[in-house]
Amino acid sequence: MINKYIYLVFILLIYSVIAEGQNTVCFDIEPNPNSSDPAFSEFTKYINVFGIGIYAEDGVSNEKVKHVAAIFAEWLDNNEDSIVDNSLVLNELLSRGALMPVFEDEGSPAEISFFENYDGDGVSAVCYEFEIITYRPLVNEFDATIEENLHTISSLGYANAYPSAFSEEENSNSLLTLAMDLARGGHFTSIPNPYPPEAWYHYDDYTCDYEC
């Protein structure tokens, strides 16, 4: 019986070390390098991830800013060897000035200033403070950081590096869009109500367009 308890304690210790290692973030928050640009003037926090800027306003905690940066980095460097796994994707992101804005809330000063003044092509998604979950999500929770970072990387990176496979344009006939149309039971530019019986993928976010 004692041996079983020792074994259990050992397993729990190993698990705690692994969990702690997965949550370790090695990024430092820097001052906003583009504070003189009207579009970025309300951001006070910045992290450089392989040349891609993570910009956050003051109301977003340092922990959450670092979490967004860590997830972005892991999408690009999954084995965490500090080398981007796909240089073509990174080059497409950099050529478009890809970035990830992190706003405290919808309609915040930073969001208003950003979208009133930004005229680039580097934004495909944004993060909001209330959507970011830095701990292990519960059953009814989802860390939107994962999805929003992937939107940016897929839309600006993969879709341009490999258009025949990953283009998100509705008439591109890419492998991605053909697979999605098959899963949804047809080609729909708006959400069908209801989905056809043969559909096995039912996406119902009315804030999204076909590409989303």
Language model features by range: what are they?
Residues 199-212:
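Extracellular low-complexity, Gly/Ser/Thr-rich intrinsically disordered linkers
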Residues 23-26, 30-32, 45:
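A eukaryotic "domain-start" boundary segment
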Residues 5-15:
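Sec-dependent N-terminal signal peptides
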Residues 42, 49-198:
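Acidic/His-rich structured neighborhood in mature extracellular/periplasmic domains
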Residues 1-3:
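N-terminal secretory signal peptides that target proteins for export/translocation
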Residues 19-21:
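Boundary at the C-terminal end of the N-terminal hydrophobic targeting segment
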Residues 28-39, 62:
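Catalytic-loop region of hydrolases
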